[in-house]
Structure formats: C-alpha cells, structure tokens
Amino acid sequence: MGRYRLTKDADADLLTMFLYGFETFGVARADAFRMDMVRCFELLADNPRLGRSADEFAPGARRHEHARHVIFYDEQPDGVLITSIIHERSMPRLRER
C-alpha cells in the first residue's frame, strides 16, 4: 500500500476548501468532502500512474481530476506527494501564469 503526503501548500488548499464547505454547507458536508479527498489521495498513492502528465505546470508533475477539483502531485518511491489542490474554476487562471 502506497502512502501519500501533502506539501504545506496542498495542506493549506485542503484546509481552505474544508473551511469554505463548513461555512457554506455545514460540518457534515465539509467533513464528507475531506474524507472523499483522503480516499482519492489513498487511491493515487496506490496507483500513482492513474493521473496524467502535467509537465506543462512542472516537470514530472501529474494531475488527477476528482469531482470539481484537480489534484497535482509528484510520484515518490513509496507513493505520492500532493503538491496542490485546485478547484476547476481556477484552472484557466492557473494556465495564464
């Protein structure tokens, strides 16, 4: 079984999304969102090639679309390192950088 780790930026992304969900939809939906993301991270850790190449953002990076979010990560010998989590609405702005 692979393992996943989050960078500080990815951890901050997840916290921001959780807090938005908490304030907008309540604790139950926010917690369900967080658990769903954790399951996705575990899936990626076990199957690092599930995502597709994201070399256009960073050499060696991979991306995986999950629900309305894009998870960027790097393959590691023992799993994956989640580098950022971005809502799909933010993707056009990210491409402009």
Where are these regions (language model features)?
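Arg/Lys-rich, positively charged N-terminal/basic patches that mediate binding to nucleic acids
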Residues: 1-32
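Basic/aromatic recognition patch in beta-strand/loop cores that engages polyanionic ligands
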Residues: 49-78
